Amino acid sequence: MRVSGTRSFRACGTLLLLTLCVAVAGASQAGAVSGKRAARGLHVSGNRLLDASGRVVRFHGVNRSGTEYACIQGWGIFDGPSSASSVKAMASWHVNAVRIPINEDCWLGINNVKARYSGRNYRRAIVNYVRLLHRNGIYPELSLMWAAPGSYRATYQPGAPDKDHSPALWKSLAATFKHDRNVVLAPWGETVVNANCFLRGGVCEATFGPNNNPYATAGMQQAVTVMRRASYRGPIVIPGIDYANNLSHWLSHRPRDPLHQLMAEAHIYGKNTCSSVSCFNRTLAPVARRVPLILGETGESYDGSDCGSSQISTFMNWADAHGVGYEAWTWNTWGNCEALISNYSGTPYGPYGAWIKAHYAALR
C-alpha cells in the first residue's frame, strides 16, 4: 500500500530536457576523507550499531535539506549556513547524526549544472561539511536523493535510482568515504517501485520527464556490490519501499552484503499509511530485531500541515522503546511546519521544534 503522499519540498524545479549527450566515467576522488582517526569506527553487530569502542550508537539526529536542490537550481550548495557555528547549534540540541541529501548531477558534475556548484566543488563542500560534523561529535548519513536518467536534470526525487548515472554516483561516493568509518551511506531515499525491482533493478513503476516515461532503474543489490568494490567497508543503509514507509518486504528482499553491514531505514510521518504503533509493531519491530533500524525521515505530518507534537512524540517514544534511531525533518528555516528551527542559532520553530529539542535533551 502506498503512503498517503510525499512531502512538498521547499523548492522543486521544473523539468528540463537537455539535448546534450552525457558521458560519465565516474567522479574524481579528490578530497576523500582521511581515515586515520576512524580505523574501525561505526559498524553493525547483529541488530546494533556500534562505535569503534564497541558502544551502542543510536541516532537522534536531523535532516539538513538543501544540498539536494540548491545546486541544481543554480544558486548554491547549502540552503543556509554550513559554518562551524551552525553545526555547534545542532550539537547544542544534542544531535548526534545529520542526514545529508545528495544530488546525483551535482556530485557527478553532469547535465550542465553550474560548475561553481557541481563536480569537484560540490564534492569538496560535502566532504568539508562531513569533517565539520565529525569535529562536533556528529555522525553523517549521506543519502542519494535527487537523480535523473539520461540527459534529464535531477530536479526532484524520482521513483528509483537510475541505471544511467546512479552506479557511478555510488562508486564515487563510496571511494570518497572509504577511509571514513564514522559515516553511513544510503544509496537511495524513497522509492515507488516494487520490492523485486528495488532489489534487482529494471524497468518497472519509476518514470521521469514531462511524459512520465519509464526508465531503467538500478537496484539495491547493485548499489551494495558497487560500494563494496569501491572499498567502502562501513554501514550501508537500505530503505523500505512505498516512500520508505513500508518495511514489510525488507527482510525478504534485502541485498546480500559480504561484510554484513546493512542497516534498514524507514520514513515515518503523520498521515502516512504506516504511522501507528500497531503498524510499527507489525512491520518495523521484526526488522529492528534483526538489523539496526533508523527512521531516516520523520515528522509531525508528511505535508507540513501540523506544527504540533502528538505524532512525533508517538513515533520517537516507540523508537526509544525498541532501540531504533531517528533523524527529524528538517533543520531548515522554512517558516512552515516542516521546519525545526526559526534561525540557524537553533531557536526552535513552533511546538514541533520545541518538542524535538526537549526530547533530545532528555535523552542525555
Predicted regions mapped to residue ranges:
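Signal peptide processing junction and immediate N-terminal pro/mature segment
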Residues: 25-32, 235-237
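Bacterial N-terminal signal peptides
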Residues: 12-25
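Extracellular glycoside hydrolase catalytic/binding regions
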Residues: 41, 79, 96, 103, ...
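Bacterial N-terminal signal peptides that target proteins for export
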Residues: 1-15
